[in-house]
Amino acid sequence: MVNPVIFEFIGTSIHNQLNNYVTMVASNTMNMIATTAVLAGGLYYTAMGILMSVGRIEGPFSQLVISCIKFMLIAAFALNISTYSEWVIDTVHNMESGFADAFAGNHGTPSSTIYQTLDNSLGKGWNIAAMLFEKGDNRGLTQIVQGFSELLLSFLVAGSTLILAGPTGAMIVATNAVIAILLGIGPLFILALGWAPTRGFFDRWFGTIVTSILQVALLSAVLSISSAIFSRMVAAINLASATQSTLFSCLSLTAVTIVMPYMMYKVYEYGGILGSSISAATISLGSLAVNTAKSGGGAMTSIFSGSSGGGGSGSAKAGGESSYSAGGNAMWSPAFRQHVLGQFNRD
């Protein structure tokens, strides 16, 4: 039983270096932006609170409080290396290996890293090649033709698997390097989530990471599919049959080897298309709540307006009061309070 650790050895070495890089760069990024972020956030919310209290800005004070709490939560992730490592870096790595295992169809104990998934797929192809090589090597002189055919097929399967696994592994290593760089500068983009004008930077950063994860997972799926195809094609080969051509079997495996790299590049491209549509708006609980409230409010309005009957004046009055309060004309609204106090100061 062949259990190669080629990609795990290479990938783990690179992965350890990238982890050190991520921790160092993320820590340096946090130190660089911490003072600016705290001062800018403090000045922004202080100024907004003062302007709302004197009536220069109209709006509910609760919205400012919620925005301030949201900013503090975001800063807790973006400015603390322990929290960032546990909740962001580890989560991204677990997503990567989890998606790769799921898409590759691995059963039993899941792989600890994406490189172990690659080695598992490579091992399946090489186990088929080893089985064919052993059968061919055990042939006697009277079965030299069958033995030579099995040896040829074993080398073909082993070479085809390596041809597929090699570029796939290289692309995955390159993609992991991109993920490491993005995670290193991630605190800056996570902090950008705190303000609406800069939220688009986080969207693009988050979408690029999800794109890379999907590309790695889809590449693992292609490698697993190619191993399954090799296994089925080799199992269908009967070298002792007088009607089956060894040349045809070799050509079939060669055709699969040519088609699979094209499929690999296509799914890599499709992974980029799928990931580019990811946006932070899709995971915003606030936007979900607003959309739900709007749809529910529209349904309730249609129900009550349809059953109001002759109560038109009462409905209009209630609607007027509702819009009057919703527009900020309440005693806790600074602009409204200033207007009311101004009425008493008239001569």
Swiss-Prot record:
Stored Pfam families: TrbL
Record-annotated disulphide pairs: none
Sequence intervals crossing the membrane: 32-52, 61-81, 153-173, 177-197, 205-225, 245-265, 270-290
Keywords: Cell inner membrane, Cell membrane, Membrane, Transmembrane, Transmembrane helix, Virulence
Signal sequence segment: none
GO cellular component, one term: plasma membrane
Membrane topology: Multi-pass membrane protein
Biological processes per GO annotation: protein secretion by the type IV secretion system
Similarity field: Belongs to the TrbL/VirB6 family.
Identification of the protein by name: Type IV secretion system protein VirB6
